[in-house]
């Protein structure tokens, strides 16, 4: 609302395919449907899996660099097992909510942790390309699904992936390769 109240515009389902840069100043964007939007300021809110936007930035000589990220799997468990382990009883009391957990560990100076634990949750596909295998988790408001799920991830550093450290796409390409397996 703040952006709109200040005279800004928000465009959904509108893919940016190029930047408008004049004399080293950002002036606007060009979109896939042929439109051009110019403004004194543009917020680039790329969202999930916007690898193509990193290429647009790089092609426009905007410095980008690879950074460590977390990569992992989503693990599903019967909710009853999590409740038993966390509440230390064979049957969860009806006034207690479905239990959750958080795992955090450092192994050889590398973070390994659970992420986005979804008690009474659902695993859902969320690939952005047809040839990807990507999932996420969520919990309905009542958290009444018989299963729980959680992401379990490990930190991936530049030195974990072959190739020069100066390649800004090294880790993005690695991520894309994993998601296509």
How would you name each of these model-derived features?
Residues 1-181:
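Residues forming the flavin
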């Amino acid at each position: 609302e703040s952006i709109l109240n200040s005279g800004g515009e928000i465009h959904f389902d509108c893919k940016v395919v190029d930047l408008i840069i004049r004399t080293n100043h950002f002036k606007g964007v060009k979109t896939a449907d042929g439109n051009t939007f110019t403004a004194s300021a543009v917020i680039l809110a790329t969202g999930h899996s916007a690898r193509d936007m990193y290429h647009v930035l790089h092609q426009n000589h905007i410095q980008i660099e690879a950074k460590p990220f977390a990569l992992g799997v989503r693990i599903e468990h019967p909710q009853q097992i999590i409740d038993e382990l966390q509440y230390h009883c064979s049957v969860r009391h009806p006034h207690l909510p479905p239990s959750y957990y958080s795992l955090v560990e450092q192994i050889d100076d590398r973070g390994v942790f659970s992420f986005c634990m979804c008690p009474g949750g659902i695993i859902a596909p969320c690939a952005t390309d047809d040839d990807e295998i990507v999932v996420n988790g969520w919990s309905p408001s009542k958290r009444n699904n018989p299963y729980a799920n959680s992401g379990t991830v490990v930190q991936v550093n530049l030195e974990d992936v072959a190739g020069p450290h100066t390649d800004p796409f090294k880790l993005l390409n690695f991520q894309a390769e994993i998601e296509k397996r």
